[in-house]
């Protein structure tokens, strides 16, 4: 789960990480009132959407005139921002962050996440703050600093000093070394206590006053840990999430909307990804990732059908199920009952493999439903691509 920048900064402040004074704003009138209260030489008005690249898309405005904040708020609220992370449809702006500006002397990059190679929380740092870290890693990997933290021991002062000296803070500004080490400890606490998946500050600035400030922030949470954090759950902004993904979550389905025209319903994440790959190889594009889990019961399949059919781009549905512990004839019964209940209006191809697959395929073939049955993955992909009007 992602949160907005203003929410991330609120968490930073709770854990002792310095941030600019700022406030969430949802109207021009509120912008005026807050600007008068803030009374700073420079005001920064930032669109709040769950995507990066806001500055390049015109979503970040800077002014020295507090009277201009209302006009900037009016300009941004309701605007659709298109960035490299939103896709062509963009994201509509519903709220802003209005905060004080800062005197920037140096920009750094800092984040903490779980390193997939080690399984340990790991700090990522760079002197190339304010840039896309993926671009830095690609073009100048030598500028990426990593410091892994043994979770059995926790963060230690030497971990912070390792990062500080690797960044060259002793040359850049020695006065911030101790506050920097303390900040890393606070970020580690935030990461661990809140079950975060990513905590990122980009840029972390050293000001001309020789202080550290988190100028921009991002926090993502592990969905599996949300049940432990009611305060984090309250930060969820459903306006920023795909409605079909929200519905899928409510039905305990793993769904990600894509831009293709073939709806996929699969049991197991690995098989789901393989299914999307083979659809592309057959000459079409998947409309989604949908993992119905191990059961593939009538209820889960029916919920999956409803979600897929609500996507106007879906011109056909490909069900690809492997029967392991759950036998294929039981899965077939679930598919048949769900299809009758939902009333499928697009071509449907079902591929069954695994325990009692022949029996399951026979049930489907004898069901009287308008569907195609296959036992081979490539054959099934070619069938659904052909039925949706695209040549393989």
Language-model segments: residues:
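Short internal beta-strands
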Residues: 345-354
């Amino acid at each position: 789960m992602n949160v907005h920048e203003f929410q991330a900064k609120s968490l930073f402040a709770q854990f002792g990480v310095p941030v600019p004074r700022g406030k969430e704003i949802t109207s021009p009138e509120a912008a005026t009132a807050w600007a008068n209260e803030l009374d700073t030489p420079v005001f920064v008005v930032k669109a709040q959407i769950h995507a990066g690249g806001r500055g390049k898309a015109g979503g970040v405005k800077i002014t020295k005139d507090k009277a201009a904040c209302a006009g900037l708020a009016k300009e941004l609220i309701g605007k659709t921002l298109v960035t490299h992370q939103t896709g062509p449809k963009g994201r509509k702006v519903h709220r802003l962050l209005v905060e004080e500006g800062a005197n920037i002397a140096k920009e750094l990059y800092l984040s903490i996440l779980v390193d997939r190679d080690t399984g340990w929380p790991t700090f990522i740092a760079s002197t190339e703050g304010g840039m896309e870290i993926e671009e830095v890693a690609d073009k100048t990997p030598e500028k990426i600093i990593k410091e892994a933290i043994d979770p059995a021991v926790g963060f230690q002062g030497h971990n912070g000093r390792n990062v500080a000296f690797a960044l060259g803070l002793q040359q850049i500004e020695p006065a911030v070394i101790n506050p920097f080490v303390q900040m890393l400890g606070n970020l580690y606490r935030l990461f661990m206590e809140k079950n975060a998946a990513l905590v990122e500050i980009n840029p972390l600035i050293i000001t001309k006053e020789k202080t550290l400030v988190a100028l921009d922030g991002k926090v993502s949470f592990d969905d599996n840990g949300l049940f432990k954090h009611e305060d984090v759950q309250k930060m969820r902004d459903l306006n920023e999430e795909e409605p079909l993904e929200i519905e899928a979550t409510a039905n305990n389905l793993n769904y990600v909307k894509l831009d293709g025209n073939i709806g996929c319903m699969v049991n197991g994440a690995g098989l789901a990804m393989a299914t999307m790959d083979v659809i592309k190889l057959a000459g079409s594009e998947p409309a989604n990732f949908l993992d119905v889990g191990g059961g593939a019961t009538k209820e889960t399949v029916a919920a999956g059908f409803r979600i897929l059919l609500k996507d106007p781009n879906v011109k056909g549905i490909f069900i690809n199920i492997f029967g392991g512990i759950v036998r294929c004839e039981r899965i077939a019964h679930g598919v048949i009952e769900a299809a009758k209940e939902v009333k499928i209006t697009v071509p449907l191809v079902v591929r069954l493999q695994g325990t009692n697959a022949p029996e399951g395929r026979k049930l489907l073939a004898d069901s009287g439903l308008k569907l195609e049955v296959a036992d081979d993955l490539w054959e099934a992909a070619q069938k659904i691509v052909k039925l949706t009007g695209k040549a393989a």
